[in-house]
Every structure is written in C-alpha cells, then in structure tokens.
Swiss-Prot record:
It catalyses: D-glyceraldehyde 3-phosphate = dihydroxyacetone phosphate. PROSITE patterns: TIM_1 (PS00171), TIM_2 (PS51440). Homodimer. Substrate binds at N9, W10, K11, G172, S212, G233, G234. One of its GO terms (molecular function) is triose-phosphate isomerase activity. It comes from Chlorobium phaeobacteroides (strain BS1). It is an enzyme of class 5 (isomerase). Its EC number is 5.3.1.1. Pfam families: TIM. Belongs to the triosephosphate isomerase family. This is Triosephosphate isomerase. Pathway: Carbohydrate biosynthesis; gluconeogenesis; Carbohydrate degradation; glycolysis; D-glyceraldehyde 3-phosphate from glycerone phosphate: step 1/1. It is found in: Cytoplasm.
Amino acid sequence: MRKKIVVGNWKMNKNVAEGVALASSILENLDGGKMACEVGIAPAYPVLSEVGRVIEGSDICLVAQNCHYEDEGAYTGEVSVRMLDSLGCSYIIVGHSERRQYFGETNRTVNLRLKKALEGGMRVILCIGETLEEREAGVTDAIVTAQVREGLADIEDLGNVVLAYEPVWAIGTGKTATPEQADAVHASIRATISDMYGEADAEDIRIQYGGSVKPSNAVELFGMPNIDGGLIGGASLKADDFVAIVNAAG
C-alpha cells in the first residue's frame, strides 16, 4: 500500500520569525512530528535554514519550492541543488503551475530541474495540471499526459519521484475538483506511467492532489483510490488547518 504524503507549500509567505512560529506550532500539534503519513513543509528560500532547525530530529521533511538545473554559475537569483542539500532539504518541488505561468518554465526546463535534483540525491515532487480553458476544451488528459511524459523524459527510476496533480483552476480560487474528477485524472496519470514504466511502477508511484485542499474536503479527497495525499497551499499557512489535513491522510 502506498504511504500518503502531505506537503505544505508556503509559497512567498512567512518571514523567518513567522516561519519558525508556524513550524513550531505544526510540530507541537503533530506530537513532535510522529505521523502515520509522510509530511513535509516548503518555506521560501530565506526561511529554509531556520525552519530546518525547528523540525530537525522529527519526521517532518524540509522541502524546497524549486531549484536550478546547473550546479553553480552566473544565474542571478537562482539556487542550486547543492545549496538546498546543505540546508537539509530532502525534497524539491519542480514544475509548479505558478513557476510555469509567471516565470516561463516549460516541460523541458522542468525536466532539467528534475534530473538535477535526482542526481543530487533529492526526492522530487513533479507538479502537473491543466488550466480552466484546457479543461473546458476537453484536453485535460492530453495536457497532463504531455507534462508527465516530457517531465519524466530520460528518467529511468521513479523511486524518488512523487507526482502532484494540481488543476490550475483550483489553486487559490476556492474551487476544488470533485473527488471523482481528481481521481479520474490520477487514474489517467497512472495509465500513462504504466505505459512508460510498467504496471508495477504505476501502482507504486504516489500522486498527490493540490488545489484548495482544506480540512473540510481532505478526508473525502484522500479516500479516493488513486489520491495519495496532498500538496497544500493556503491551508498550510495555518497550523490547525494543516495538521487537520495531515490527520485526514493518516
């Protein structure tokens, strides 16, 4: 059975003091970080180090929101996998829809980031998902399949890869895919993985759902057969809400 994974993506929220306070509250309310599911939190870059100190020794993973695909060099504003490793990160998110929408990331550059993260010994959360226009045009499966195939190009081992399906139209909007809608896309993603890697890998890979997950809908979403936890945005900024979502997965 796949172990569920819940990751709080803080995005560009919380300074150091606020991040430390939030992480401390999450840790306290999760009984010192002992959970039935896997849990991670992804602060902004400047907050990673201090939050890492808070959760050190617990089972909560430190997660980075992105990485560059080069080891070092003249890439102003970018952060390398080696730097993130030195801060204690164990997961890196790549391909989040906001990175694709606002910063021009493509399936190709997402694939480069994913490769570099895996080469650096990291586990990776690969984000995929369609816009409202694409869903209404009936091309959800085609878009998501292309993102999976191109994002995982030349990747032979999926052991350190988690997928996160995040319908762009449901992120931060209050709209949520119904559990049945989300599970149908997750099933389609598994079919793509089966075609690429075989049935065993398709059964083993974990696929999170992201998009306005909150305590009131988490139990139903996480109860679907193909949904293996969540990539949580806004609700991860309140300790009580995030802990309730974690408990829904446990």
